[in-house]
């Protein structure tokens, strides 16, 4: 008697080394449990990856205050890339997040204006010069730059006194020059205090988008 064919045209007698088995049907409860375990595993993996990304790469940040208007508004949410400066340099125009030099328990967000070895000054109208060359700051709103020069004179720097940026330090200012507590008031930011670059605004939705920007200056030293 010929044994039952497993596949059309093939029987267990065609090859004596073939062992034919018939898997038992799993119970519905066992199948459901396996599915639950699989989903749970995937959720845990995704959560772990999310934590690693937040800890080592990207951090969500809430903007508090108006010192970066009009680029950033109070209560907006942004993503900060904490990995950006591991292999790349800090550039002029970068919007950075750093530990406040006078109280490292606090974080500030400002724009990088002066790089190491730069000579910085501000003229009577509030325009910044770097190494004697004017800095293109098209991102500023003129109505928020009326008292910028006064703030310069009230800080550690006075009219006619250039700021020399030391190696491994940076000079930062808020885009809202009339309402920003920045390097004009408390000096330079150590490079080691800068821990991220503002990359993307994700809230509010109407203003969602990249925060990358550059500024131009003729770096003749």
List PLM regions with ranges.
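Hydrophobic membrane-insertion alpha-helices, especially the h-region
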Residues: 41-57
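Soluble "head" domains of membrane/secretory-pathway proteins
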Residues: 2-37, 56-62, 70-221
């Amino acid at each position: 008697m010929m044994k039952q064919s497993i596949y059309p045209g093939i029987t267990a007698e065609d090859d004596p080394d073939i062992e034919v088995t018939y898997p038992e049907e799993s119970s519905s409860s066992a199948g459901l449990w396996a599915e639950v375990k699989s989903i749970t595993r995937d959720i845990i993996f995704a959560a772990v990856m999310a934590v690693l990304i937040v800890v080592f790469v990207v951090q969500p940040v809430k903007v508090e205050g108006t010192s970066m208007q009009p680029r950033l508004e109070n209560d907006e949410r942004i993503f900060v890339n904490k990995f950006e400066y591991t292999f790349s340099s800090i550039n002029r125009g970068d919007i950075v997040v750093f530990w406040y030099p006078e109280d490292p328990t606090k974080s500030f967000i400002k724009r990088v204006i002066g790089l190491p070895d730069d000579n910085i000054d501000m003229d009577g109208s509030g325009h910044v010069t770097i190494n004697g060359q004017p800095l293109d700051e098209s991102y500023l709103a003129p109505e928020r730059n009326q008292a910028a020069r006064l703030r310069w004179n009230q800080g550690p720097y006075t009219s006619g006194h250039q700021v020399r940026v030391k190696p491994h330090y940076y000079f930062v200012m808020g885009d809202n020059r009339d309402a920003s507590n920045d390097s004009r008031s408390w000096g330079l930011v150590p490079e080691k205090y800068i821990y991220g670059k503002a990359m993307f605004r994700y809230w509010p939705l109407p203003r969602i988008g990249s925060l990358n920007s550059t500024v131009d200056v003729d770096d003749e030293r």
